[in-house]
Amino acid sequence: MFDGLFDFLQNILLPIKWVIEQILVFFHTLLGFLGFGDKSGLSWALSIVGLVIVIRATLIPVFLKQIRAQRKMLEIAPEVRRIQEKYKGKRDVLSRQSMNQEMMEIYRVRGANPLSSCLPIVLQMPVFFGLYQVIESAQNAGTGVGPLNGPLGMDFRDSRIFGVVPLHDSFSHDFYALQAGQAFNLITMIVAGVLTAIMIAVQLFTQLKVIPKNIPENAKNTSVYKNQKVMLYLLPIMFLGMGFSFPVGILIYWTASNVWSAVQQAVAIYRNPSPGSLAFELRRKRLGVQNKKTKGQRQQPVNKRRAKRR
């Protein structure tokens, strides 16, 4: 049963892995023209960053849809809270069904979809697993399903960041080697730790400084906002697990993707904030200052004779 499921997932990821390899090789070739060596670990690391740029740029329309969905959820949050208060303490099946029906009706009328905000993450997961398998395949056999084959696949496998950190190495691999008294790569552990720290710092900055500015005051007591605060504590724990377990190449991808998300959120909130939020008021002040400068009445020059008569 599990073998069949594994083969099914492998078949789904096959075209994704092929596309990932094409993008990696494209950026690796481009960086080669710019003076990076064929076996340079930095070249392959930057190629992974290039993969992030391509994937996230492709998902910009989905991100904009996510922003609209989040805004809709915040707009209807007071109505959802009223329904929850209406059925508070009622645990019978009929009451729960009635509550769900009323909430679904609000979602339908207002055009909101609670699942739309998860779409960018869901669409990135196949790329994440595809890249993981590309790195694993390169480590085990030096062969891929696309252009990462033959000598190029060997170069990808043998590349080292700073000359010592393989893309397929992980913190956990060297940590267990250290515990067993075997040879381990301290630089890999340091690089993995730094990348994990950057991931957590960027995520905390986004959750604490960027997103709260875009939440209206009347929505801060809703379950939607409380769920976001829960994620504030869960995501760093998840990132710690990722930093411990996943290869350095995956950590590069996820760190670059987190930085992209933070910048994208900040730009979207700056240009199109939610009504009633702090970011919205700041934008109004910015526009008000600009309007005062541009809409001021032009004073006509007065010649000397007219000035003397006055």
UniProtKB/Swiss-Prot annotation:
Protein name (record): Membrane protein insertase YidC
Family: Belongs to the OXA1/ALB3/YidC family. Type 1 subfamily.
InterPro entries referenced in this protein's UniProt entry, alphabetically: YidC/ALB3/OXA1/COX18, YidC/Oxa/ALB_C, YidC_ALB_C
Any one biological process term the GO annotation gives: protein insertion into membrane
Region (Disordered), start-end ranges: 290-310
Lineage, broadest ranks: Bacteria, Bacillati, Actinomycetota, Actinomycetes, Micrococcales
GO cellular component terms, A-Z: plasma membrane
Pfam families: 60KD_IMP
Bilayer topology annotation: Multi-pass membrane protein
Protein role: Required for the insertion and/or proper folding and/or complex formation of integral membrane proteins into the membrane. Involved in integration of membrane proteins that insert both dependently and independently of the Sec translocase complex, as well as at least some lipoproteins. Aids folding of multispanning membrane proteins.
Molecular functions per Gene Ontology: membrane insertase activity
Subunit composition and interactions: Interacts with the Sec translocase complex via SecD. Specifically interacts with transmembrane segments of nascent integral membrane proteins during membrane integration.
Statement: the UniProt record of this protein carries the keyword Metal-binding: no
Stretches that traverse the bilayer: 16-36, 44-64, 115-135, 186-206, 232-252
UniProt keyword Thylakoid, yes or no: no
Alphabetically ordered keywords of this record: Cell membrane, Chaperone, Membrane, Protein transport, Transmembrane, Transmembrane helix, Transport
Subcellular location: Cell membrane
